Amino acid sequence: MFKKIAITASLAALALSSSVTFAASEARHSISLIAHVPTNGFYVVPTDSDLVNKDQDMSFQPSTGKMREVNGFFDVRNNNGSVHASLESVPKLISGAEAIDLQVLFNNKELTLTPQMVVGESESDVNYRAPLKISAKGTTFQPGDYTGVVAMTFDAVPPIGGGK
């Protein structure tokens, strides 16, 4: 009986040690996920999520003598009125005491701190694709490593004269 228990205990120990060995060579990964599902009646979403999720390079190009531009598209819809947009702060790139002012065009309209219509009632009633362009103002730029943020706000504005 003692031999049976000893053999069984030895086999159990062997099985457990091989499990531990297997676990020591295990790899685990976590992937962060996010999702946004807009309402069917109002949305303003980039066609390429990298536009808003990754840094956009506006570096100076010696071959052209200009800063790179940021270009992209947004799908826009408001089935009950127009879409207005504004900037949350003055758009600029900053490097220490130096700054480069930026121009932000959405649907070919320059955005400011004051909300303005960027997509009309008839265009926004169906999925409308609006271009975005961010460019540097001026032609002379001081050397440096610049960073900045362009923060835009989009509002669903009810139709003039009531609902549809």
Show where each model-derived region lies:
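Repetitive helical segments and hydrophobic/amphipathic motifs
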Residues: 12-13
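An anionic, turn-rich surface loop/hairpin at beta-sheet edges
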Residues: 112-128
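Bacterial N-terminal signal peptides that target proteins for export
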Residues: 1-9
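N-terminal signal peptide c-region/cleavage motif recognized by signal peptidases
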Residues: 18-20
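N-terminal small/polar-rich segments of proteins
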Residues: 22-94, 124-164
